[in-house]
Every structure is written in structure tokens, then in C-alpha cells.
Amino acid sequence: GAGLPLKLPEYVDEKTAIAPIVSSGKAARLILNKWKRQYDRTADFIVIEGYKAGGHLGFKKNELLENTCASLKDILKDVKEVVKGFEELFNHAIPVFVAGGIYTNDDIKEMLEAGADGVQMGTRFIGTYECDASMEYKNYFINGKKEDIKIVQSPVGMPGRAFMTPFMEKTHPIKKCFRCIASCNMKSIPYCITQALINAVNGDCEN
């Protein structure tokens, strides 16, 4: 979800389903136009991540802090309108799923009634036995409070929603660059996102 997958069709064969994550109708239109023009392909489905999602967010930091982002329902309406034309062009349905802040059965029903074809849920299941993350990592979600969640600037250049762990409260020197993100400058970023994710899943939430 960190950025626009404009070249995604280049990396998969025609039998592999491709599905972009978007945060607006504008982003959906840009991606689908690019795929149609350059690859003569379209999305098999689309996932909308609203401003309440965890991780990287496709909104401006000030919009997130001031709570002025478009609602998930409004974005859904815009994306469904964009998708119509491409469904007609390619003669197949493009289901639209929504994510971000969906937590209960009532939340799911509300979005289905608003026109979504389904929902995506991630954070809800981190504390389950089936999730293979460490117990230390899970405990941040199980015991965390609303005040512990902050909007931070990620090394990929986008704002994100994260728990303010001891790790997030200090700058970590980068010892090795994995070159996982072309736009990442190890001299200016506060920490290495790849190493941080590996450490967190393994239970080292301090580093």
C-alpha cells in the first residue's frame, strides 16, 4: 500500500490476478488508465484503504492530524464510478473491497450496504492464535490504548499510523541498507523500515 503500483502488470504473467490498493477515485483512475494504455490490462479487484487504516496511508499528514480526510463511503462512491467504465471496456466485473476502521459485524454490514463488494480486515486478527507474529508484538495491540497510536512519517516518505513504542520514540542508526525502496535515503531517514518490521515480528519491539 505504500505508493501506486503503476508497473505491477510487468512483474506477473497474464494468469496472475492484480489488485491495486488505493485511497481515492483519482488514484484508481490513474492506475487503471496506465494499465489499460501500457499493458491492455485492468484490475481483477480493487482495495480501498481509508484514513483509519493501519500502516502507510495515502493521505496528507495534515489531513490525518486534522481529521479532514474523505470518508470511506465517499471514496467508495468515487472509486465505484471510476470502475464502471473499465468494467465495460474489459467486459468483466471489478469488485471493490474496503479497509480501514472496520472492526465489527455492524461495520461490515454498513459498508456492504454502501456498495462495497467486501471488506479487508488486518489489525483485528493480529492478536489471534493463528497470527504468527511474536507474543511481544501481539501484546502491543492487545494492551494498547487509543492514545498510544500516532501518525508518524515513514522512511518511504508517506505518513503512517503506528504504536508509539520505545523504538518509535528514538532515532536508530542504520547499519545496513537493503535497497528495498528506491526513494529511501539512508542518510536522512530515522530508521530502516525493513529491519524494524523483521525485529517486531520476531518480538524485539524495542529495536
Regions found by a protein language model. Give the residues of each.
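Short catalytic-loop micro-motif centered on adjacent basic/acidic residues
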Residues: 19-20, 96-98
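Active-site entrance/lid segments in N-terminal catalytic domains of soluble metabolic enzymes
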Residues: 1-89
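Conserved active-site-proximal phosphate/metal-binding subdomains
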Residues: 53-97, 103-207
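Charged, low-complexity surface patches
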Residues: 1, 100-101
